[in-house]
Structures are given as structure tokens and as C-alpha cells.
Amino acid sequence: MEKQTVAVLGPGSWGTALSQVLNDNGHEVRIWGNLPEQINEINTHHTNKHYFKDVVLDENIIAYTDLAETLKDVDAILFVVPTKVTRLVAQQVAQTLDHKVIIMHASKGLEPDSHKRLSTILEEEIPEHLRSDIVVVSGPSHAEETIVRDLTLITAASKDLQTAQYVQELFSNHYFRLYTNTDVIGVETAGALKNIIAVGAGALHGLGFGDNAKAAIIARGLAEITRLGVALGASPLTYSGLSGVGDLIVTGTSIHSRNWRAGDALGRGESLADIEANMGMVIEGISTTRAAYELAQELGVYMPITQAIYQVIYHGTNIKDAIYDIMNNEFKAENEWS
């Protein structure tokens, strides 16, 4: 692939890691953010110490606060901003962009009030004459591992296969490999909903439960994620792939996962306010829990784990009581769909 110019919107942990992947592949990378101190640190010291204390970035990676300068003559734009501001940033891009580009996003969540997927938001806010079909970049990936060039395999999903293949080639190298998929709904819902299950898995650890319980929540969590995804139009096969069970395993079992760590702290009795203050990073699983719960209620989809976590987070239900309620639900067959 010829050298491409890519704007990465969002200098968080994952945006920074993906910027390095693109730079390693010989592309021009421009990171955009709205914190002058952070942007200056990236350009002056080639570090982003809030996320990576010991990592030095290539000096070819340039950061900007000016969106127009960032987007000038770019070939592709990668959104890696928190879910709650995706629409706002997309509106700013639509007002600034003056040519057609490939639009990608690598964030995982649902818009809190509308319950919409992020690709839908980007489609709504960025006119068709300025963009390709949206490409979702998602899968089992800790930024802490990708930034040190550990092996990572994820998915590029788009309704248009050729556009997904462009992104596959854009990112893939000897340590970072992408597979294509045309099931955007499946890949996107898997990436968003696994954060909820990761909060639950972390809570079980914080409460002192063993591996049996942790395996159960991942397996049963995958079942309810699949039920909701299929109700929205996804293929059930997607959830057995990298963006489904793969991402759920890596997020639901690792201390690298901020959603798992948040759940672990909840299980140990910390308040949600203290957890969010101490974490210093967005915990997408918290807001996604409400969106998924309300969406499941609207569609009549059975999601007992999501419901339990929703009750704990938003109504102050005791975690042990929530677990007791799940364990005393009506008996069901394992493959029952409701």
C-alpha cells in the first residue's frame, strides 16, 4: 500500500497505540486532541505518560489541537473518542472536512440516550459525499500490549468489503493483523456489550469468587450479548469470532481492562464515584450498561447479567443480592433463546 495520511481523533491509550501501528507501517499520522498540555507533550517529548509511562513514540507522529490542520488532505479518519462525545466530534468533522475520505472508528459503546451504535452516529452526522461506508475496527486488544508491539489480531468490519480490505491493509503488519467482516452490527454490538460483562467479571473477582464463576459469567454473558445482537440484525456467527468471544475473554479476564478493574473495585466495596475519580479514564461499560438495559427492555430480550449490573450501578442494589437473584432465576435450557 502507498503511504497514506491518517487523522487519529483521540489521543487516549487506544488512539495512541493505533497511531504507532500506522506509523510503523510508513503512514503519516496526525493525532488530534483538545488538551494543549497533552498535545505539547506528544510533540515535544514524544510521550503520552498519562497512559504509557515508559513508552517513547516515534517523532514522526505529530499531534494537533486544530481540527482543520489535522484533516487537511487526509486519506482516512479514525475516531477513537469516548462514546458520549462521538456525535459532537463527528459534527465538527462534517463542518471542517472538504473532501471524501475513509471513515473508521475504534471506540466501543452505545450512545447513552439514543442507544445507537457509533457507526450509525457517524452516518447520520457526516454526509455521504464526504465519506466511505463506515469501518469498525474492533477485537481483543489491550493498548498496553499493542503499544509494545505484542501480537494482536482484530477485525475490520464494513458493509462494503473493499473498504474493509483497505483498512485491513492499512493496519496489518508482522505484529498486528486484521480480518475483514461485513457484519457491522455484530462486530459493533460485541465490542460495546462485552464491557458490561467485564464489569461483572471484575466484580466476581473483587468478591472473591473463583474461576468457575468467572467462566460462567463469560459464557452466559456471551449468550445474552448474542441474543441482543441478533435481535438488532447481527449474525450469531460473529460472536464466535475475534470481535465476539475473543474480545470478551481479553476484557473479562485481564487487569489491563479498565472495565474489569472498575468491577473489581465495585466488588471490593468502593463507590462508583471513587472508582471513576481514581481511574482517570473513561469506563465505557458504565454508560453502556444503561443503554443496553433500556434497549433490551424495548426489544424484549432476556439479559439477566446486564439487568443485574444495571441494578447495582444505577439503583444501588447490593452485588451479592444481585448474584443471588440470578442464581434463583427460573430454570432454563442452556441454548434457550429467551
Swiss-Prot record:
Residues holding NADPH: 13-14, 108, 143, 258, 282, 284
Principal location: cytoplasm
Gene Ontology MF terms in the entry: glycerol-3-phosphate dehydrogenase [NAD(P)+] activity; NAD binding
Binding of sn-glycerol 3-phosphate, residues: 108, 139, 141, 194, 247, 257-259
Signal peptide: none
Active site: 194 (proton acceptor)
Described purpose of this protein according to its UniProt entry: Catalyzes the reduction of the glycolytic intermediate dihydroxyacetone phosphate (DHAP) to sn-glycerol 3-phosphate (G3P), the key precursor for phospholipid synthesis.
UniProt family annotation: Belongs to the NAD-dependent glycerol-3-phosphate dehydrogenase family.
Protein name, as recorded: Glycerol-3-phosphate dehydrogenase [NAD(P)+]
Organism listed in the record: Streptococcus pneumoniae (strain Hungary19A-6)
Gene: gpsA
